[in-house]
Each structure stands twice: as structure tokens, then as C-alpha cells.
């Protein structure tokens, strides 16, 4: 999936409408970040089909969790924000049994496997114009989910994400996830 694929597919999913993700669910899923003082996702909305998830999120990075402020959004923060939006978007899809291959998981199963069983297999990022870390947004699209039957059975999750701010700051990434221990 390439960056150019994001907009047409997003229009199709968005036409079905996204719904807000409840703060209670965000708090539960983002607890591993909150406990370290690096929850950057303020709020999010999502929609899902049997093999795709679309999400929008608003972020703020008041203080970087790992370094003094660089004054701009960087690669480490891109991955942290991607993780937060992806974890948050898949949680209600699991809860509502919208993704066929994950229908055997409860929300408790999802949270139990969230950190230990969801891996980044590949990642690339692109920074077009410096992004203000104080206030920015993102759009995430994961589609064409596929169960891979190898030594380790896993769910391949190809994703693209775009970040922007109100001053024209822009960054994007292509990330492939592997979800292990799937039902």
C-alpha cells in the first residue's frame, strides 16, 4: 500500500461515517503511555470493515517523553503517535466484532495482547514540512488485513498514516504490523 492509495480508499470508508472512540476506552488502551507521561492522543474517531480500519486523531506533545524538545515532530514521535492511534482504532473494532479475523478476541484479550503481540515489521517515514508538536492531527488507514500461515501465524496489517498541522506541517508513514496470537 503506498501513500497515493490513502485518499481514494479513505473516501469510501469515510462515506460510512466515523464515530468517536469513548474516552474510557482510550484511557484503557493508552494506559501504557499514560503511566509514563507520554499519552499524546487527545481524542479519536474510527470506522471499520471486515478487513480495514480508518481513524482520525488529534494530538499534542507537551513535552517529549525521551528527549528535550526539538521544537518539531520527529521520527520517534511519529511511531509513538502511530501506535497510539492504531491501538485506539482497533480497540472498538474488536469490541464491536467488526474485523472478521479478530472476532474471537474480547476487549480483555486485545488489551492483554496489545503490547506483547503487536509488532512493527516494517516502517518508513517522510517529513515534508516541520510539524508543530503542540497541536496536530492524523489520519490512519489499515487495509487488506491478511492472515499469514508460517512458523508463526499472524495477522499482516498494512497501514499508512498522514500527519498535518494548521500551518501546513506534514509528515507521513507506511507501517506494516504483525499481530500475533490471533484467534
From Swiss-Prot:
It comes from the Bacteria. Changing residue 83 to A: Decrease in acyl-CoA thioesterase activity. Keywords: Fatty acid metabolism, Hydrolase, Lipid metabolism, Lyase. One of its GO terms (biological process) is fatty acid biosynthetic process. Its EC number is 4.3.2.11, 3.1.2.-, 3.1.2.2. Gene3D superfamilies: Rv0098, thioesterase-like hot dog domain. Disruption phenotype: Cells lacking this gene are shown to be highly attenuated in a mouse tuberculosis model. It catalyses: a (3R)-3-[(carboxymethyl)amino]fatty acid + holo-[ACP] + H(+) = a (2E)-enoyl-[ACP] + glycine + H2O; (3R)-3-[(carboxylmethyl)amino]decanoate + holo-[ACP] + H(+) = (2E)-decenoyl-[ACP] + glycine + H2O; a fatty acyl-CoA + H2O = a fatty acid + CoA + H(+); hexadecanoyl-CoA + H2O = hexadecanoate + CoA + H(+). InterPro entries: FcoT_ThioEstase, FcoT_ThioEstase_Rv0098-like_sf. Involved in the biosynthesis of a unique class of isonitrile lipopeptides (INLPs) that seem to function as virulence factors in M.tuberculosis and to play a role in metal acquisition. Catalyzes a Michael addition of glycine to the beta-position of an alpha,beta-unsaturated fatty acyl-[ACP], producing a (3R)-3-[(carboxymethyl)amino]fatty acid. Acts on the (2E)-decenoyl moiety loaded on the acyl-carrier protein (ACP) Rv0100, forming the product (3R)-3-[(carboxymethyl)amino]decanoate released from the ACP. Homohexamer. Trimer of dimers. This is (2E)-enoyl-[ACP] glycyltransferase. The gene is fcoT.
Amino acid at each position: 500500500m503506498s501513500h497515493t492509495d490513502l485518499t481514494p480508499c479513505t473516501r469510501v470508508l469515510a462515506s460510512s461515517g466515523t464515530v468517536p472512540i469513548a474516552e474510557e476506552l482510550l484511557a484503557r488502551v493508552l494506559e501504557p503511555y499514560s503511566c509514563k507521561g507520554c499519552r499524546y492522543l487527545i481524542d479519536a474517531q474510527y470506522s471499520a470493515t471486515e478487513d480495514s480500519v480508518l481513524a482520525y486523531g488529534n494530538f499534542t506533545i507537551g513535552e517529549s517523553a525521551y528527549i528535550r524538545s526539538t521544537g518539531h515532530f520527529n521520527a520517534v514521535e511519529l511511531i509513538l503517535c502511530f501506535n497510539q492511534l492504531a491501538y485506539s482504532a482497533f480497540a472498538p473494532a474488536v469490541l464491536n466484532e467488526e474485523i472478521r479475523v479478530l472476532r474471537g478476541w474480547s476487549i480483555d484479550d486485545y488489551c492483554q495482547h496489545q503490547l506483547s503481540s503487536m509488532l512493527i515489521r516494517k516502517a518508513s517515514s517522510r517529513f515534508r514540512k516541520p510539524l508543530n508538536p503542540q497541536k496536530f492531527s492524523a489520519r490512519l488507514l489499515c487495509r487488506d488485513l491478511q492472515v499469514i500461515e508460517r512458523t508463526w501465524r499472524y495477522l499482516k496489517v498494512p497501514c499508512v498514516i498522514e500527519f498535518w498541522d494548521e500551518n501546513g506541517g506534514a509528515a507521513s508513514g507506511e507501517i506494516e504490523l504483525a499481530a500475533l496470537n490471533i484467534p
